């Protein structure tokens, strides 16, 4: 089971950590390290594949890319990689892949804390004509992401809640 595999892989670390959101935490969920194990990545991909509703998926570079690839292969859905920053060369696009007008896209993330990364991806998709109604993460830290996203008309779904890991 995924929860046990995450714990056994050492993906749950205890100590003093600063999260992407800038918040301090007594624990850290290192999904990126965990999904370097193909068994765990496959489990994550299978779980999320069953939760995807839209015809396309998207996520922020770097953390969600392996998950996007796994889910894309399993569901045969195309994906979009959202860049964290403006590209200074080439096309200068904020994303890789295509976003079509009025196309519904589910966002996938590894860990949701405040929902900031998911919201940033949603804004880029929406600003380019796409529709975002759902986000799916491996772990919801239960620190406000679901509430903030709901205020922006996005439902958050997760495989695991942080309270299940402690």
From Swiss-Prot:
Q: Which UniProt keywords apply?
A: Glycosyltransferase, Magnesium, Pyrimidine biosynthesis, Transferase
Q: Which cofactor does it need?
A: Mg(2+)
**Which terms does the UniProt entry file under GO BP?**
'de novo' UMP biosynthetic process; pyrimidine nucleobase biosynthetic process
- Pathway it belongs to? Pyrimidine metabolism; UMP biosynthesis via de novo pathway; UMP from orotate: step 1/2
Superkingdom of the source? Archaea
Q: Where does 5-phospho-alpha-D-ribose 1-diphosphate bind?
A: 83-84, 89, 109-117
This enzyme catalyses: orotidine 5'-phosphate + diphosphate = orotate + 5-phospho-alpha-D-ribose 1-diphosphate
Gene3D superfamilies in the record, alphabetically? 3.40.50.2020
What InterPro entries has UniProt attached to this entry? Answer: OPRT, Or_phspho_trans_dom, PRibTrfase_dom, PRTase-like
Report the EC code(s) recorded for this entry: 2.4.2.10
The entry's function note states:
Catalyzes the transfer of a ribosyl phosphate group from 5-phosphoribose 1-diphosphate to orotate, leading to the formation of orotidine monophosphate (OMP).
* Complex formation: Homodimer.
The record's section on PANTHER family has: OROTATE PHOSPHORIBOSYLTRANSFERASE, URIDINE 5'-MONOPHOSPHATE SYNTHASE
Family per UniProt?
Belongs to the purine/pyrimidine phosphoribosyltransferase family. PyrE subfamily.
Q: What is this protein called?
A: Orotate phosphoribosyltransferase
Origin species, per record, is Picrophilus torridus (strain ATCC 700027 / DSM 9790 / JCM 10055 / NBRC 100828 / KAW 2/3)
């Amino acid at each position: 089971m995924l929860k046990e595999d995450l714990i056994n892989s050492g993906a749950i670390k205890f100590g003093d950590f600063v999260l992407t959101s800038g918040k301090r935490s007594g624990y850290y969920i290192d999904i990126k390290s965990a999904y370097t194990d193909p068994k765990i990545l496959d489990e994550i991909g299978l779980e999320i594949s069953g939760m995807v509703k839209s015809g396309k998926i998207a996520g922020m570079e770097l953390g969600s890319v392996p998950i996007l690839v796994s889910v894309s292969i399993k569901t045969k859905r195309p994906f979009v990689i959202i860049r964290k920053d403006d590209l200074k060369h080439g096309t200068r696009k904020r994303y890789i892949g295509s976003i079509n007008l009025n196309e519904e896209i589910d966002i996938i993330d590894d860990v949701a804390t405040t929902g900031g990364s998911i919201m940033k991806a949603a804004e880029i998709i929406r600003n380019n004509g796409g529709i975002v109604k759902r986000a799916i993460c491996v772990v919801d830290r239960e620190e406000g992401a679901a509430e903030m996203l709901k205020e922006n008309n996005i439902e958050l779904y997760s495989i695991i809640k942080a309270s299940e890991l402690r």
